[in-house]
Structure formats: structure tokens, C-alpha cells
Amino acid sequence: MGERTLHAAVPTPGYPESESIMMAPICLVENQEEQLTVNSKALEILDKISQPVVVVAIVGLYRTGKSYLMNRLAGKRNGFPLGSTVQSETKGIWMWCVPHLSKPNHTLVLLDTEGLGDVEKSNPKNDSWIFALAVLLSSSFVYNSVSTINHQALEQLHYVTELAELIRAKSCPRPDEAEDSSEFASFFPDFIWTVRDFTLELKLDGNPITEDEYLENALKLIPGKNPKIQNSNMPRECIRHFFRKRKCFVFDRPTNDKQYLNHMDEVPEENLERHFLMQSDNFCSYIFTHAKTKTLREGIIVTGKRLGTLVVTYVDAINSGAVPCLENAVTALAQLENPAAVQRAADHYSQQMAQQLRLPTDTLQELLDVHAACEREAIAVFMEHSFKDENHEFQKKLVDTIEKKKGDFVLQNEEASAKYCQAELKRLSEHLTESILRGIFSVPGGHNLYLEEKKQVEWDYKLVPRKGVKANEVLQNFLQSQVVVEESILQSDKALTAGEKAIAAERAMKEAAEKEQELLREKQKEQQQMMEAQERSFQEYMAQMEKKLEEERENLLREHERLLKHKLKVQEEMLKEEFQKKSEQLNKEINQLKEKIESTKNEQLRLLKILDMASNIMIVTLPGASKLLGVGTKYLGSRI
């Protein structure tokens, strides 16, 4: 693999400017004086990454060459300190964010952890926390060891047996449920065991085997009931139970020259063993191709920003003496992400309305049609970026925000229309106004002359395009301003008899009344259009909410089914290995999963309750609430 040159905060093709590229790793979680702290500068970097992340964490005993593999993934010869001396270099967890080579619009986050089992550490408990954090944060978890996967190697992996005490899936598990750790496999990362300086032949009973088969054979339980054997089996059991997907890579010794081994980052590749380089490339190729995007339960995609929140939440829990809990972390994440989802959706609405609207619109309906399209997109943005909005608190905020913004656009439209119409009417009536001031109509027959010129103004005004929603109201105000003038001209017209004047006055009053009625009908029509727009908003929110709930249900169902498949596979393997009792112990977990799957398949009543709650919030929040009651009842009725 050629070296990839990276520059700090320089955008590359396919890598948005907001996603800054790191020139070198930075400490993410510092382990100083037996205290874990999150580095604020590292959080600033994560905060700028809005892309989904693929998180690869590596752990292992100190001085086993972990950092070399991570530098290789970053496309650099050096970066993570290799720690070739007796003193281990990496303290805490170090992070390097680079563009993903094979997943467009994704960021690869590499996490290198301090070596486990360092004799200089006064508190070995921190090793356990580093191990647990690496599991919680990663989508691919790499365990690095030396020589072979034997009894000693598995004993050194005792940290995996402590995970049940260091991690919680749920904040308040029910007493009748299986152990909390039974759910680990639903959200734990893929497990990759890398074995360095491997000298054995990959054979079993004289037959060639793959690296993966070598790992699975090493994880088989040892028969026997004495405590020593049971302790030896614990890491094997935990790895098989907790990690659904497992992979193994073995590496030859990179070189036999000890001097080179101490300075691997400075050794030209031609001086390293060719087979070792091929094995390293295979490992990197697998990561780039198969390492998954980091997700939380129910398919919540983790971005760089979200990863930063998770780090802080987990480390805060550890420092407070509590146990990091996935459910609590997701809740904390939702409280930060959901307001941002509301803002993002509202901004999208404003931007699209501003781009698509040409004020003044010819009719109110034209504006409402654009509003409906922009609102639909904004709701989709909110649904995509929000989660765990269980009380619909943030959905209500979005409804409120968009309604206010819509009201602002309606007001701007009215103001633009009124301003334009007044200017046009003033221009068209200039000659009429001048004639009145000069007394042109104060002559016998002047009333007819006045009416003709006024009618011409009205006709010319009618021909003005795109006057907008205030066209009639502005005209009506203008005509109203002419009533006294017309009455004065009429009374002073000596060419008309008293009877003709009375008829003319009555005709003027009738025309004015008709104009008033026309204006009233127009306002009623607009009110009806606004009400219909509210109904469309209600229908759109409810439809997208229903779609999101259905997607969440399907995600949960797939999650349960994958976990059930994994449990059944473990149970089958236990039976094959003649561990009947351990196989039977899985029955409770398997039966509970089957019940959850059936319950999830038939969740219509629960979904209807959620939709009913959302419907009630929508009805109260949207203007014209009482008129929407029937719409809500009809919508829910159609879903029963």
C-alpha cells in the first residue's frame, strides 16, 4: 500500500470542507493518574464530522505491534507511536480520522489503545475500562496478540469476561428478563483477532484450515468441570456469546532483524518480509471492504459528532462510579441531536421556501403549494435525524417552528402584494387624481367623465400581472377613498336631474356593496385554503411518522432475528461439543427472543397508541385545532 499524504483540515474530493482531515493522531481519552478524561480538542474534531463513521479500535498487550496496523490503515508509515521500547507509548485511547477509501461520504475513525497489562500501571482496573470503551465505541474491534491463540493468550483476554460487569444494555432491565449481557450481541462490534509473529502451520488433524477456522477451533470449550477448566472456558464463551461476527488474521514475523523490529516506522518496505506485507494488505483490504458503519440499536447511524457525545457519556459514567449504559447513552444523544434535527429541518424549510417562492405569489394557493412541498422535505429531514422522541416533544417544536415560519411567509407575501398593488394603482390613477385637483370634472356632464376615467383605472389595474393576494383589498381601499370625491362631483353636476343623481348614488352604493361581498368571499376562500393546508400538514406529519415507526419496527425485528439466529447457532455448537447443560441454559434467552419477535410482528396496537399521541399533539399545535379533530379520528380509523 502506498503512503497516503494527509494534511490537516484540508478538504479532499468527496470529503466536504466541514469534515476536517487530521494530519496526525490525537489523544481522545487520556488515562492520567488513574483518571480517564476526554480531550476537548479531539471532541472539536469529531464535532465537525457530520458523515457516518466506521470505527476500528485495536487493543492488546503492550508492545505487540498494534500501532503499526493502525498506521497502515491510515495509509501512513508513522503516526500512532509504535512503542518499540520497554516503556509503552500510547496512554489512553488515541484517535485518527481519515477519509474512508471505499465508502464514499464516510469517515474512518481509527482508535489505538494503550497496551494492556503494562507493569507500570498502578491500577489495572483502567485496562478493563479501556477495553470496555473500545468495545462500546467501535464497529470493528481488533484484538492483537503474539505467537498463537493458546491457553495463555485466552487467559490474557480475561477482560472480555468482565464486560458483563462493565457495560449495561438497558438502564432498568426487568427482573423476569434474561441477563442484561444476553443482549450484548445485538450491538457489540465485529470481533477480529490478529495474531502477530505466527509460526505454526494452519492445520488441524493434518488437514489445512483457514485463519477463521483456526480461531473457531481455539474458541471451542474444553471438557471438564474443575474450576481451572471453567475459568479457561470463560473467555471462549464470552467471545462466542457477545460477538456475532468473528474474523482472524495471522501475520508472519515482519523481519528477523531485531534492529528493524525496534524501528518499524523507519524501515523501507523492501526490507520487510514480502509475506508479512501481503498479510498486512489483506487485513487492510478486509477492513476497508467489510468494516461496518457504526450504528446503535434500531439502526441509529453514528456520525463523528454523535461519536463524540458517546465518548463523553461513557467516560462521565465511568468517572462517576456508574456503569456505561447503551440505553442511557442513546437517550443522552437524543437530547442533543433532536434539537439539532428540529433546527436542520426548519433551516431546510426556510431555505427552500426562499428559493422557490417569488413574492408576491399570484394566489395564496400558490404559496401554500410551495409550503406543502417544502414542509414535506423538512419533515423528512427531521425524521431522518431524530430518534427516541418518545413524547413527541421535538416533533411539536418542529410543527410550531414551521407554522410560525409559514405565517411569516404569508405575511411577507401580503406585504409584498400590498406594496406592489398600491404602487401600481398610484401610477395608474395619477391622471385621474390630477384631473380631480384641476377641477376637470366640475362641469356639466363631469360625473360621467369621472366614471369613465375611474373605470379605465380599474380596467388597467385588472390587466397588471401577478398583483398577488392583496389585489382586491387594495383596489377596494382605493375605491372607498373615491366615494366622497364621487359624491361631490355627482352633486355638482348640473347636467343631471335630482332623480338621475339619486339613481347614480344608489348604483354606486350597490357596486360598493358587491365589491365588499367579493372581498369577503375571497377572504373566506383563503381561510378555507388555509384550513385545507392544515389538513395536508396533519396528513403529511402522520404519514411520515407512521413510516418512521414502521421502519423502526422492521429494524428492531431484524435485530431480534439476527440475535436469535446467533443464539441458535451458539446453542447448536454447544450441543455438538457435548455441552448439554450450557445448551439448555440458552433456552430462556432463545424463548424470550422468540416472544419479542412475535410481539414486534404484531405491534399494531402499540403503533396506534403512538400515532394517537402524535395525532393529539398535532391537533393541539396546529391552528384550527377543533376542525382537525375529525381529520385525526378519520386518519386513525383508517389504520385500524
UniProtKB/Swiss-Prot annotation:
Keywords: Coiled coil, Cytoplasm, Golgi apparatus, GTP-binding, Hydrolase, Immunity, Innate immunity, Membrane, Nucleotide-binding, Nucleus, Ubl conjugation
Ligand binding (GTP): 60-67, 82-84, 112-116
Swiss-Prot/TrEMBL induction comment: By IFNG during macrophage activation.
A Pfam match: GBP_C
Alphabetical GO biological process terms: cellular response to type II interferon; defense response to Gram-positive bacterium; defense response to protozoan
GO cellular component: cytoplasmic vesicle; cytosol; Golgi apparatus; Golgi membrane; nucleus; perinuclear region of cytoplasm; plasma membrane
Recorded GO MF terms: GTP binding; GTPase activity; identical protein binding; protein homodimerization activity
Its EC number(s): 3.6.5.-
Compartments, as annotated in UniProt: Golgi apparatus membrane; Cytoplasm; Nucleus; Cytoplasm, Perinuclear region
Reaction equations catalysed: GTP + H2O = GDP + phosphate + H(+)
Record domain GB1/RHD3-type G: where: 50-292
Region called GTPase domain (Globular), residue ranges: 1-325
Modification after translation (UniProt): (Microbial infection) Ubiquitinated by S.flexneri IpaH9.8, leading to its degradation by the proteasome, thereby preventing its ability to promote host defense against bacterial infection.
Residue ranges that the Swiss-Prot or TrEMBL entry lists as coiled coil: 499-612
UniProt cross-references to InterPro entries, sorted A to Z: G_GB1_RHD3_dom (IPR030386), GBP_C (IPR037684), Guanylate-bd/ATL_C (IPR003191), Guanylate-bd_C_sf (IPR036543), Guanylate-bd_N (IPR015894), P-loop_NTPase (IPR027417)
Protein family (similarity comment): Belongs to the TRAFAC class dynamin-like GTPase superfamily. GB1/RHD3 GTPase family. GB1 subfamily.
PANTHER family xrefs: GUANYLATE BINDING PROTEIN
Subunit structure: Heterodimer with other family members, including GBP1, GBP2 and GBP5. Dimerization regulates subcellular location. Interacts with IRF7; preventing interaction between TRAF6 and IRF7, resulting in impaired TRAF6-mediated IRF7 ubiquitination.
Functional note: Interferon (IFN)-inducible GTPase that plays important roles in innate immunity against a diverse range of bacterial, viral and protozoan pathogens. Negatively regulates the antiviral response by inhibiting activation of IRF7 transcription factor.
Entry protein name: Guanylate-binding protein 4
Organism: Homo sapiens (Human)
